[in-house]
Amino acid sequence: MPQTTKTESAVVSLAAIRTPRRGVTEYLFFERQQIFTVRASAARRAESANLLRRALREQQPLTVVLDPRRGEIQRIDTPTAKELELFNRGKIAPDVRGTARKIDLARLDPSTFNVVDLSLKVPIFRLCKKTIPNYKTAKKIFDFCAKQSCHLGGPFDITPCIPFQYVIDGCYARAHKMRQIITTKYRYCCEKVFSFANSGSDTLAVKADKWGGCCVFWWYHVAPLVRVRIKLGRFRITLAMVIDPGMFDKPVLLSTWLAAQANKTCSQNANVSMYSIQPGSAYWPTSFSGTTFGTDPNYSLTNGTLISYQNLITCP
């Protein structure tokens, strides 16, 4: 049965605390793409703010109860020893880390931006050479992934299903499951592309047209990035394309994916501050600057999140 509201308990670490001008203080967690606030009595709000500020200052994780539908932090606790043990995770080694770049969407030229080795000179691309041979194959991969969406009811070709119908959070898990499909079922290269709203009051804002048309807001987003060879007359070029069935009905150019996250009808602060292309093993960010990343090599975090979100929906 689809659910519109579900509180969840999680161990998280703070990426940043920011207070927009004349706005409500926002709390950003590495383990959640969604932006959260504290809405309570003045006394409770002050107590929570102190706990959160101390956790950020001391770089200590917290156990929180979150209400994703309202984007609110309902309770804050100290993690148990067992929770801390499970929370510890690996990070991408510096020698295989990818490229992070600031971006001005208004000045982006799609005719050149998406061309690999022209505008997109990314050293980690050299680590894998088996790129997708044509758009038809990329669409086949996209369609296979999209068919695993939990809202379709099954039967599914994979376990667990992927909750594309719930885009409020969980992009890191959806992206990692698709990366597993692309690299093991189809055996093609798959990197990850992260978008960030980590400058000033920037916010990633998307109109969820596939799931009811409501607006959703993130501080980061991630999806599989694939390199697709395209024939143009006598020439062949390789384009960077993104597989993101939560947002689109087909593979799209990297520039299209980025632009869709700056929907001004959803927020006047809608803007992509920067993007980062990382190895497919990157799971979620571990720095607010978007330069270090955690991993999930055995897909345990991935599958747990997919199962937790499988019955949730985006728009009420």
Q: Which ranges hold each PLM region?
A:
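Extracytoplasmic
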Residues: 7, 23-24, 71, 219-221, ...
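His-Asp-centered catalytic microenvironments across diverse enzyme cores
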Residues: 204-316
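Cysteine-centered nucleophilic/redox motifs
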Residues: 141, 157-201, 224
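OB-fold/S1-family single-stranded nucleic acid-binding modules
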Residues: 65-100
